Amino acid sequence: MKTQFAIFLITLVLFQMFSQSDAIFKAIWSGIKSLFGKRGLSDLDDLDESFDGEVSQADIDFLKELMQ
């Protein structure tokens, strides 16, 4: 009975390790595909649009109001 229980626990641990490693490999592979795919490269350009280098007078006034 002890041997069967030990084999059961070892099998359970091995199945758990296999399922977690499969999920990790899928996440790594999807990350690689998103970096080199056309959609992945176009999605990286969205960050450039979020930064606006120009600061308007309204922005300066708002910052001055916050600092008071």
Swiss-Prot record:
Keyword Secreted: yes
Positions carrying Phenylalanine amide: 36
Record's keyword annotation contains Membrane: yes
Signal sequence interval, chain numbering: 1-23
Gene Ontology MF annotations: toxin activity
Subcellular location: Secreted; Target cell membrane
Propeptide residue intervals: 40-68
GO terms under cellular component: extracellular region; membrane; other organism cell membrane
One GO BP annotation of this record: regulation of defense response to virus
Main location: secreted
Tissue expression as described in the entry: Expressed by the venom gland.
Cysteines engaged in disulfide bonds, as pairs: none
Bilayer-spanning residue ranges: none
UniProt keyword terms in alphabetical order: Amidation, Antibiotic, Antimicrobial, Antiviral protein, Cleavage on pair of basic residues, Cytolysis, Membrane, Secreted, Signal, Target cell membrane, Target membrane, Toxin
Note: This peptide has a significant inhibitory effect on hepatitis C virus (HCV) infection (IC(50)=7.62 ug/ml). Furthermore, this peptide potently inhibits HCV before viral entry into cells and kills HCV rapidly in vitro.
Family the UniProt entry places it in: Belongs to the non-disulfide-bridged peptide (NDBP) superfamily. Short antimicrobial peptide (group 4) family.
Known role: Amphipathic peptide which inhibits the growth of Gram-positive bacteria.
UniProt name for this protein: Peptide Hp1090
Species in which this protein is naturally found: Heterometrus petersii (Asian forest scorpion)
